[in-house]
């Protein structure tokens, strides 16, 4: 069996974690797109794009990729590189090169991590061999657009098998897109084990003391407009409780009143892997106060270091954060519920320690491990 895995830099943490196990089971080639729009992601921070367009072995054009040795097979790691002022137009050409590569490779299956962009539509020539992981059965608030809907509609119509990562939204997904049940494969995320290979030093990033963490790209649906007011209430009961907000993106509300508070620190920028790992490893627990969701890579990053999570009762989050086992599930859009849950965990280190132990036990082996998930997906590849 020979598999081509077409990943995205913005999903590289989950891709690398999955491929670490998948490449043990068969020949899996990893092909990742790099262009001026996509140079940074959870596992990559490419400072300068290679000045030629084409399909290359990753280490041949980005020698720094050698750091992934031991995580994935570097001989099977390729970069689809598109550069220059008119990169968007050049992408149509580089994707033709990718199509030729896939045809010559005679792959059994082609696994896509994201619905193809307009400049990738040529890849549908091989649609009969494709599977697609649908990370978001429904677009997040603020991330929907006509072009996104178009890409999803084409993908769901042409790609024979679709993989979803939570069961709660399965029936709604089938009904909304009018899909036959046999086309949709149930799977799940495991913790982002790739992050464990990242060296980090908390002293280098100004990390000290006890704190809780919100991490990830700033988006409207992430619920920071509920978390920041909640922290004012938390501070009245637990003056020593600090929140660090770490992630790039634009706030959709005015944060001026929170920027001067000594118990809230906002790092509103791209957070490289080593800093993110240091922040997660040293926090007491993480908070995901999302107003809508499918599943969450942030939660899987927390679980890589056995950190409990407070999450809201939206989308597939309750499947990921088993209430009172891996953390707490609370009502969404509720400042009081957020404040009460934060105070509860902050005051009870023994409870957070017990949650951490359950995460470590359940995600190391068994049905929540990447080994188990990869084995099940390979049955679908066959």
Regions found by a protein language model. Give the residues of each.
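A short, histidine- and acid-enriched strand-loop-helix "catalytic/donor-clamping" loop
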Residues: 82-83, 115-120, 130-146, 160-161, ...
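A short, well-ordered alpha-helix in the C-terminal region of glycosyltransferases
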Residues: 337, 344, 351-366, 376
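Nucleotide-activated donor-binding/catalytic signature segment of Leloir-type glycosyltransferases, i.e.
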Residues: 254-278
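Conserved donor-binding/catalytic core segment of Leloir-type glycosyltransferases
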Residues: 204-222, 228-231, 244
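Acidic donor-binding loop of glycosyltransferase active sites
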Residues: 278-294, 307
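Donor nucleotide-sugar binding/catalytic pocket of nucleotide-sugar-dependent glycosyltransferases
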Residues: 158-197
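A conserved mid-protein helix/loop that constitutes part of the nucleotide-sugar donor-binding site
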Residues: 13-17, 219-233, 300, 336
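Conserved acidic donor-binding segment of nucleotide-sugar-dependent glycosyltransferases
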Residues: 266, 323-324, 328-335, 344-350
């Amino acid at each position: 069996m020979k598999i081509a895995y077409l990943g995205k830099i913005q999903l590289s943490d989950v891709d690398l974690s999955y491929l670490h196990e998948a490449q043990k089971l068969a020949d899996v080639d990893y092909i990742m797109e790099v262009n001026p729009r996509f140079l940074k992601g959870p596992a990559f921070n490419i400072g300068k794009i290679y000045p030629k367009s084409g399909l290359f072995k990753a280490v041949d054009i980005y020698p720094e990729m050698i750091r992934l040795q031991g995580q994935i097979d570097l001989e099977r790691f390729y970069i689809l590189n598109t550069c220059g002022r008119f990169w968007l137009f050049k992408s149509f050409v580089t994707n033709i090169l990718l199509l030729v590569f896939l045809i010559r490779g005679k792959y059994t299956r082609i696994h896509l991590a994201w619905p193809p962009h307009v400049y990738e539509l040529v890849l549908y020539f091989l649609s009969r061999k494709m599977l697609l992981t649908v990370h978001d059965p429904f677009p997040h608030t603020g991330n929907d657009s006509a072009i996104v809907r178009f890409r999803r509609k084409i993908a769901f119509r042409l790609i024979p098998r679709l993989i979803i990562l939570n069961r709660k939204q399965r029936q709604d997904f089938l009904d909304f897109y009018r899909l036959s049940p046999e086309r949709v494969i149930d799977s799940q995320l495991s913790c982002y084990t790739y992050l464990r290979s990242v060296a980090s030093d908390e002293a280098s990033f100004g990390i000290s003391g006890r704190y809780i963490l919100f991490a990830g790209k700033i988006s409207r649906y992430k619920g920071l407009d509920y978390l920041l007011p909640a922290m004012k209430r938390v501070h009245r009961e637990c003056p020593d409780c600090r929140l660090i907000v770490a992630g790039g993106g634009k706030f959709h509300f005015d944060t001026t009143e929170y920027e001067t508070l000594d118990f809230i620190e906002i790092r509103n920028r791209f957070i490289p892997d080593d800093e993110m790992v240091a922040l997660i490893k040293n926090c007491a627990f993480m908070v995901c106060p999302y107003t809508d969701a499918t599943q969450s890579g942030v939660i899987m990053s927390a679980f890589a270091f056995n950190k409990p999570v407070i999450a809201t009762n939206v989308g597939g989050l309750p499947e990921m954060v088993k209430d009172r086992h891996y953390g707490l599930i609370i009502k969404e859009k509720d400042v009081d519920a957020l404040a009460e849950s934060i105070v509860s965990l902050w005051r009870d280190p023994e409870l957070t320690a017990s949650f951490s132990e359950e995460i470590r036990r359940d995600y190391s082996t068994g049905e929540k491990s990447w080994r188990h998930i990869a084995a099940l997906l390979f049955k679908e590849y066959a």
